[in-house]
């Protein structure tokens, strides 16, 4: 068995195995642990009472967190005409059509979000093998294919998170940076869970939000006592 590093030992000494933590307690504890050499994110994992093998129980959506994620988001938009001007005015980093597609095919993929207006999908459709593996392919289910590209850009810049259940019925997303006030972080998590409940599949039975776990990028996951959340 591999030996624990000094950092791992220091973390293990502060964590109570099997404990469900009050949200503020968990956030404060995670922030106090030995840090990595970069500003870590707070990440949330929510175990849902769904069967992801059934297509009608795949949970996929996007929501704008009230306090953002603390990340600077680079956005590319496929559109043209007045919509292109609106996208730039909303803060898009790059707007184009065939020219933008050519750049991406050549390897220029330094974007966090790619948005497209419906009329631009004829161009975007050629980029499936480029954008798909990186999770950048525009999709109407998460608001990245929209006739209102300006609003889509504003949402992305404001801290919109996109999520989808994995094969175990768990969604994972970042909800802020270490350094966020615990109250604001909590409101972000509550907004996410409220959105998950809003889109609960009709065929999902029993307990829907089964478990909520908060962690930092390089830190341990702490199970949250859901009674400490206003959801």
UniProtKB/Swiss-Prot annotation:
Molecular-function GO term, any one: structural constituent of ribosome
SUPFAM superfamilies (UniProt xref): Ribosomal protein L1
InterPro entries named in the record: Ribosom_uL1_bac-type (IPR005878), Ribosomal_uL1 (IPR002143), Ribosomal_uL1-like (IPR023674), Ribosomal_uL1/biogenesis (IPR028364), Ribosomal_uL1_3-a/b-sand (IPR016095), Ribosomal_uL1_CS (IPR023673)
A Pfam family matched in the record: Ribosomal_L1
Keyword terms: Repressor, Ribonucleoprotein, Ribosomal protein, RNA-binding, rRNA-binding, Translation regulation, tRNA-binding
GO annotation, cellular component aspect: cytosolic large ribosomal subunit
Superkingdom field: Bacteria
Family of this protein: Belongs to the universal ribosomal protein uL1 family.
Function: Binds directly to 23S rRNA. The L1 stalk is quite mobile in the ribosome, and is involved in E site tRNA release. Protein L1 is also a translational repressor protein, it controls the translation of the L11 operon by binding to its mRNA.
UniProt name for this protein: Large ribosomal subunit protein uL1
